[in-house]
Amino acid sequence: MVRYISTRGGGEPRSAASAVIKGIAEDKGLFVPDSIPALPFKPSDMTGRPYKDIAKAIIGAFFDDYTEEEIQACVDGAYDSKFEAEDIVPVVKAGGAYFLELYHGRTAAFKDMALSILPYLMTTAVKKENEAHKIVILTATSGDTGKAALEGFADVPGTEIVVFYPSTGVSEVQKRQMTTQTGANTHVFGIKGNFDDAQTGVKEIFDDAAFNKKVEEAGCRLSSANSINIGRLVPQVAYYVYGYIKLVERGVIKDGDPVNIVVPTGNFGNILASYYASKMGIPVKQFICASNKNKVLTDFINTGTYTTDRQFYVTNSPSMDILISSNLERLLYHLSGDPAEVSSLMEQLAKEGEYTVSEKIRNGMSRLSGGYADEQETLDAIAEIYRRDNYLIDTHTAVAWKVYNDYRERTGDETPALIASTASAYKFAADVASALGMPEEKDGFAYVRALEKKTGVPVPSGLRDLDKKEIRHADVIEKSALRDAVLSSVK
């Protein structure tokens, strides 16, 4: 059985169900599998099979304390008519690559792929573990996770969900998605700060034993819907496996041939899922980690030194406006195999704002390439791929495509590439419209309508008429007031 252990070595190994409920380990580390399971099938044997079949097999391999029937029920509940694409994840050839379109769920972002199933995994885990407390989901968001988590957990019995977002660091559409969220158990707060402030605040709450005791006295237990929760990460592995199978199915590659994987990266969870897919047996030649002007990961990959002592930029790809990439800790654990080393690096980051990794970890990063695109390059990429292929992409996907093109020019590597397309262009309609040379509109919602008229690409139903919905969550709080907000939400 796969057990879940902390990246920092503390606590006892846990079942998947226990790790999903707990969210973060007792020693502040993140849960990782003690071994990564092998692919439970040969990719060529799965061609033509629906996404649900792939997801069931991959999630079941990691979460083997769930019964086959439990995993099937979770998958069936998650990947249904909530997704507007019949095949859940279309794989589209454009711009010299293959785009994994991960944004056809209810909130038009890749977070739906995991956050549609996490509530089912969580409620199943609660039953399996005989958990008597109400589960309070705490989530920090740079824009997309918050809405996807709210949509997933809204009115789920036995749960409350509390979301914190940077009040001035998300797009107009993203903000309206969260502030209009329905559900008696949903609580949304803008904070006066950036995503790192929100994420750090949430982590501090998890680490505060006295505060957790107060929450327990209210009959509740804290958990997370961020990618620090292993229940968020594992479902993401499935779509990289599915993308590989699709390329085999179409004759782009033969089973066993390598691919490159390109991911616009903020908190490092999405690209880490592709690393897990490769450890299972999907042949990956290069992982290409694409950043915006907040290029902390690009610099780390190129130098081995991670430093947060740098200017923070608000960009047109806000979901990557991050300086502290939480999931990188998991990769450091897998590459070092040494929880004491990981613990020491995380301590250095907390105290000094930087760390430098060992030669062993550097050597383990040989298949990881880093690059970045600034805001103008991002807009140019949107215009270029639309001109070339009539293909509409959002700002984050544009960063990935630009960085991939730079990599290909630099290396001459023509290995077929899967690019994670992480959000609908309509979530960032103003910037996309600007890239396409369209006239200015009065607000983000007018840009949505104008962009649909120009391109003929339908607006996702979850974004249509968003500006006409009632605002239900208008609170903006100081970054020091997160604990009070949580307590007010659970009473």
Language model: regions and residue ranges:
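PLP-dependent amino-acid enzyme catalytic core
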Residues: 1-491
